[in-house]
C-alpha cells in the first residue's frame, strides 16, 4: 500500500489482484498484512472498482460478509465500503465519455469485444492501461458522469430500489444482469471534496 496526496486527500492504493478475488484479497490483506491492518483505525473508506460479470450474481452473500467485516475494522463510525461497478467491462464506462448508450447485454466475450472495438473506433490508440489514451478519454469525464447517472436512473423502471448508495441497491445491481455503471459516483464524491 502506498499513501500519497492525490490533490483531493490522502489516498491509500491497494495492489490490484492479478486474478479474480478482489473482495477476499482485501479481507485477507486487512487481516494479515501489517501495512493494511495497522492503518485500519484511520481508514475512512475502502473503494472497490470492479466489473460485474454474469457469474458474479451468486456471489453477493459471500461478498456481503467481507464488506461487513471490512466495515467493522473501525468503530464509530465504521469504515465506509464503496462499490464502484460497471457491467462486464471498463470499456462501457469509457464509451459513456463519448455517447449515451445502454446495450441490452454485456455478458459474453463477444459483447465485451464489440464494446472495445467501438471505443477503438473513437480512440484508435486505446489499449487497457495505455495512459495516453486514458488521459484523452478522461478529458470528457463530465459527460460520462452525466450519462452514467442517466443509465442508473433508467434502471428505476426495472426495479432498482433507489439511486442512493445503499446495500439494497448494490445487491440489486450485482444481481440484476442489466447494463449499468456507478463509477460516476466516485467522481461526484471527489469533486464534492474540492468545494
Please tell me what each predicted stretch does:
Residues 2-14, 27-47, 52-195:
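C-terminal accessory helical subdomains adjacent to catalytic cores in phosphodiester-
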Amino acid at each position: 500500500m502506498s499513501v500519497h496526496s492525490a490533490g483531493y486527500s490522502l489516498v491509500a492504493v491497494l495492489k490490484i489482484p492479478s486474478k479474480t478475488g478482489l473482495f477476499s484479497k482485501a479481507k485477507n490483506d486487512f487481516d494479515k498484512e501489517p501495512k493494511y491492518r495497522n492503518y485500519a483505525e484511520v481508514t475512512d473508506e475502502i473503494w472497490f472498482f470492479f466489473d460485474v460479470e454474469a457469474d458474479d450474481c451468486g456471489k453477493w452473500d459471500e461478498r456481503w460478509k467481507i464488506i461487513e467485516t471490512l466495515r467493522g475494522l473501525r468503530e464509530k463510525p465504521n469504515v465506509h465500503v464503496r462499490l464502484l461497478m460497471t457491467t462486464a467491462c471498463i470499456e462501457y464506462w469509457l464509451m459513456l465519455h463519448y455517447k449515451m448508450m445502454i446495450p441490452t447485454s454485456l455478458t459474453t466475450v463477444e459483447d465485451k469485444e464489440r464494446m472495445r472495438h467501438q471505443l477503438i473506433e473513437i480512440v484508435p490508440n486505446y489499449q487497457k492501461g495505455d495512459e495516453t489514451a486514458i488521459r484523452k478519454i478522461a478529458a470528457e469525464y463530465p459527460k460520462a458522469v452525466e450519462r452514467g447517472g442517466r443509465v442508473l436512473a433508467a434502471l428505476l423502471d426495472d426495479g432498482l430500489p433507489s439511486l442512493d448508495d445503499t446495500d439494497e441497491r448494490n445487491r440489486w445491481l450485482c444481481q440484476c444482469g442489466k447494463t449499468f455503471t456507478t463509477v460516476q459516483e466516485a467522481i461526484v464524491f471527489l469533486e464534492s471534496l474540492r468545494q
